[in-house]
């Protein structure tokens, strides 16, 4: 509880510092002026992303050749995992969803949730590393290229542990078969997020999809820094910095990130919270 309150306090502190330099009224007005059809489009894309993430969770569980839970249990554990993300920084609270699904071993369950998190983090880092070539022109090209190559090869490197660790050898074939699928799905998921930002940002000022992807890939990198609730506050400060030179004042940048946070993170928690409440009553 104290740990959760600490990260909640940090998120609120960062937001307070941000709103000291930004007109909160402007942000609220911008949020209210987002067209309904844009909100519905962003919500529809969120549903597509959630389906893709569900597929990834299913692939992750099936790394284990002896996994045999039914689809209902897989979907229930996935939905419950969405609100659990808020319990720990970096979304690591979602690891607790392994307690809501049957598996042949604890090792297989841990490997499933770890491989899912690996795919999610890998895609975010890959996009951020690729964007760095344009967003940070002053950085060493060799250093940026090295970082990009290491990140790109990271799943292959980690796959080597399935050969050397005795408890993971049974997962080797599943890793080779499913990890490529999971990585492709996560790349698509990141592109869908960029599309959502593109739609939201263009309600305030014109920006191309390519420019959106370059800048918001760096902003999304903040989600991997495990110090706040689902990146809240940290993401807004990144957005203010990296969108300013694209013509977005602080209030407009925050409008886009807060709108997507509410649609993509808060609204999607509702089914999982309902399942948790029902389970607690039972």
Report each predicted region and the residues it spans.
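Membrane-interface segments at transmembrane-helix boundaries
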Residues: 64-75, 96-118
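Transmembrane helix boundary and interhelical loop/hinge segments in multi-pass membrane proteins
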Residues: 91-97, 234-239
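N-terminal low-complexity, intrinsically disordered patches enriched in charged
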Residues: 90, 102, 240-242, 281
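Membrane-embedded alpha-helical segments of transport systems
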Residues: 80-88, 108-132, 258-271
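Predominantly cytoplasmic-facing regulatory/coupling regions of multi-pass membrane proteins
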Residues: 1-79, 131-227, 234, 242, ...
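Generic hydrophobic/packing signal
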Residues: 64, 87-91, 99-102, 126
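Conserved short cytoplasmic inter-helical helices of the MFS fold
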Residues: 91, 105-108, 252
């Amino acid at each position: 509880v104290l740990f959760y309150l600490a990260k909640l306090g940090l998120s609120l502190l960062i937001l307070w510092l941000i709103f000291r330099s930004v007109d909160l009224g402007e942000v609220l007005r911008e949020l209210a002026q987002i067209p309904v059809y844009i909100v519905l489009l962003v919500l529809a894309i969120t549903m597509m992303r959630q389906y893709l993430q569900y597929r990834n969770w299913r692939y992750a569980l099936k790394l284990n050749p002896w996994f045999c839970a039914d689809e209902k249990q897989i979907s229930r554990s996935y939905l419950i995992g969405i609100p659990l993300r808020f319990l720990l920084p970096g979304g690591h609270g979602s690891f607790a969803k392994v307690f809501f699904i049957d598996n042949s071993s604890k090792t297989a369950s841990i490997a499933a949730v770890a491989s899912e998190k690996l795919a999610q983090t890998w895609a975010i880092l890959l996009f951020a590393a690729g964007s760095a070539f344009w967003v940070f022109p002053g950085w060493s090209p060799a250093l940026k290229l090295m970082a990009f190559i290491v990140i790109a090869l990271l799943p292959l490197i980690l796959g080597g542990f399935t050969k050397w660790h005795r408890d993971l050898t049974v997962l080797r074939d599943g890793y080779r078969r499913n990890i490529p699928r999971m990585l492709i799905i996560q790349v698509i998921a990141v592109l869908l997020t960029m599309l959502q930002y593109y739609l939201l940002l263009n309600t305030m000022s014109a920006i191309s999809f390519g420019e959106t992807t370059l800048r918001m890939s760096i902003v999304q990198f903040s989600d991997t820094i495990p110090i706040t609730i689902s990146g809240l506050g940290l993401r807004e400060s990144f957005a203010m910095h990296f969108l300013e030179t694209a013509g977005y004042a602080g209030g407009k940048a925050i409008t886009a990130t807060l709108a997507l946070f509410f649609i993509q993170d808060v609204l999607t928690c509702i089914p999982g919270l309902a399942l948790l409440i029902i389970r607690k009553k039972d």
